């Protein structure tokens, strides 16, 4: 591979990067080398990212049966078992190839009446950590037993494929993004977990009526702990079963497209849950299957496991996941969660006080290469796809086209904006707010870097924090939100609530995001069921009736 001889456009345009031109070239060359390797092995990046079409359950027309495949290079022995063989752990042995892929074949003549849609199964893995029952990494559906609370993989093969009814939604035609951040499980007013079907029937019309043109779905991939907000993923190819079936999620997306709404997935590739029973941690019995070995594979701040982005099989797994959700579920793009944690070995817990911070030994070059590949893949497979980076560090080139030497995201989250508003509300009386300071913070971005502006998201609504409405009006919201009341705190709070949003949406960026319910000043906080609150759903829901009853000022 020849070294870059021309000056990258990103460096040409930005004098600040010219002293680190060699490092910028090296970063881009790593991506180009990887693309060349993929081209030689698979022809194209789109064809390369087909792990979900090879691993897991795959039908073989020639042999008339099902293959089950799983990458477990460190395993000594692997069996598959389930209700189709009366849960006999060591009856159906899988066979290992030179690449560490274990497989078993299920002839239709023998298993047609036993291996049925909805069958439950696991793999029995003998690794360095002994014999364990595990869920395959490529499982497309995982369900929890109501009584034991144990998670089990489910063979998912509906009699008829989902009918998309000609869905060919193009997110590039909807104009400037107005994003409604939503969590399906907590979107209903009742205390409990909401469903995809309820969201489709009740919430999508609200989003459309309020003028948004995109919905960003949180907690899509399966996660064992509901209170993690979906950020401790266990099964990357399985939509959360607590909200319904894969087909019901597809119908949600199809209906959103009918309404003119793009659907963006909150994609978590920064880490994964450390649980052995539910997740992919040590799936083959080693500590370095999907993670770097030892402490390097542990995210101490989130108590979770890290991905080894430099390992080819891990890149293939994650890239296949990027394509999978676009292909199988028609998502229109991604908000990549935790990008700062991904691209730095210190996970961003430093002060970014010099240019060298973006190029020193603290940078994870493999993660940058992976993210560049992920953006290239998303846009090659779906040219209208939208990618958004959650990065607080300001890594150069994050939202610059790959061809120019950038990483290729379409947008970055304007994370300094909510921090600014919180600081103002906590420290500065509103009559002393400085309009010039507001303007400076709202417009502090490079002209070519598109920003998703937001005054608050789910982060600010969590227990221990406060929404803007609650900071402004606090306990008065409990007593004086009826239209008959006159209260200066409520009047002033509502006016500032609107002004903050007006300032943010009009000057903060090229797109705007709001978390569900915050648009009408939803009171209190989000607190998922946990032991500390008696496993209550009282604060894990949205009280839409507050804005609908006509007697309260939320409407």
Task: Enumerate the language-model features and the residues they cover.
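The feature marks proteins involved in alpha-glucan
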Residues: 1-63, 67, 88-89, 96-181, ...
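Short beta-strand elements bearing conserved aromatic residues within extracellular beta-rich modules
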Residues: 78-80, 121
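Short, acidic Ser/Thr/Gly-rich low-complexity loop/linker segments typical of extracellular
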Residues: 89-101, 410-412, 418-420
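Substrate-binding/active-site clefts of carbohydrate-active enzymes
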Residues: 143, 160-161, 165-179, 183-363
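Conserved alpha/beta catalytic core and glycan-binding cleft of carbohydrate-active enzymes
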Residues: 330-332, 350-542
């Amino acid at each position: 591979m020849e070294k870059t001889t021309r000056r990258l456009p990103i460096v040409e345009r930005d004098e600040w990067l010219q002293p680190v031109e060699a490092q910028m070239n090296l970063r881009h060359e790593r991506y180009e080398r990887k693309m060349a390797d993929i081209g030689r092995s698979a022809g194209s990046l789109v064809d390369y990212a087909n792990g979900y079409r090879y691993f897991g359950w795959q039908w073989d027309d020639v042999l008339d049966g099902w293959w089950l495949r799983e990458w477990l290079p460190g395993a000594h022995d692997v069996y598959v078992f389930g209700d189709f063989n009366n849960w006999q752990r060591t009856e159906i042995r899988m066979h290992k190839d030179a690449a560490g892929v274990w497989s078993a074949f299920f002839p239709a003549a023998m298993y047609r009446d036993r291996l049925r849609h909805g069958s439950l199964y696991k793999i029995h893995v003998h690794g360095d950590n002994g014999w364990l029952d595990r869920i395959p990494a490529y499982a497309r559906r995982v369900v929890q037993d109501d009584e034991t609370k144990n998670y089990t993989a489910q063979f998912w093969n509906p009699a008829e494929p989902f009918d998309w009814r000609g869905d060919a939604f193009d997110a590039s035609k909807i104009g400037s993004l107005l994003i409604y951040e939503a969590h399906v499980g907590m979107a209903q007013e009742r205390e409990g977990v909401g469903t995809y079907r309820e969201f489709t029937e009740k919430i999508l019309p609200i989003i459309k009526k309020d003028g948004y043109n995109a919905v960003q779905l949180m907690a899509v991939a399966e996660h064992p702990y509901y209170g993690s907000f979906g950020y401790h993923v266990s099964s990357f190819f399985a939509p959360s079963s607590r909200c319904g079936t894969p087909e019901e999620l597809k119908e949600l997306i199809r209906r959103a497209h009918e309404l003119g709404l793009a659907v963006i997935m909150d994609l978590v590739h920064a880490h994964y849950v450390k649980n052995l029973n539910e997740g992919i941690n040590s799936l083959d019995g080693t500590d370095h299957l999907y993670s770097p070995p030892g402490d390097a594979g542990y995210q101490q701040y989130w108590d979770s496991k890290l991905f080894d982005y430099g390992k080819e099989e891990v890149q293939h797994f994650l890239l296949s996941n990027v394509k999978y959700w676009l292909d199988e579920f028609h998502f229109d793009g991604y908000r990549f969660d935790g990008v700062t944690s991904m691209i730095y070995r210190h996970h961003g817990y430093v002060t970014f006080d010099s240019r060298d911070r973006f190029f020193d030994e603290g940078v994870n070059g493999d993660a940058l290469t992976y993210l560049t590949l992920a953006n290239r893949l998303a846009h090659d497979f779906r040219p209208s796809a939208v990618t958004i980076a959650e990065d607080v560090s300001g890594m150069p080139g994050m939202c610059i086209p790959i061809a120019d030497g950038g990483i290729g995201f379409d947008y970055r989250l304007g994370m300094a904006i909510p921090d600014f508003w919180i600081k103002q509300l906590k420290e500065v009386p509103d009559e002393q707010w400085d309009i010039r300071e507001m303007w400076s913070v709202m417009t502090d971005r490079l002209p070519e870097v598109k920003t998703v502006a937001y005054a608050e998201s789910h982060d600010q609504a969590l227990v221990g924090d406060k929404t803007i409405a609650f900071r402004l009006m606090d306990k008065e919201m409990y007593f004086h939100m009826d239209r008959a009341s006159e209260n200066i705190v409520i009047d002033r709070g509502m006016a500032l609530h609107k002004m903050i949003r007006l300032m943010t949406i009009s000057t903060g960026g090229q797109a705007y995001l709001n978390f569900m319910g915050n648009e009408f000043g939803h009171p209190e906080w989000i607190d998922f069921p946990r032991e500390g609150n008696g496993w209550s759903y009282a604060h894990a829901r949205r009280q839409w009736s507050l804005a609908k009853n006509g007697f309260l000022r939320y409407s």
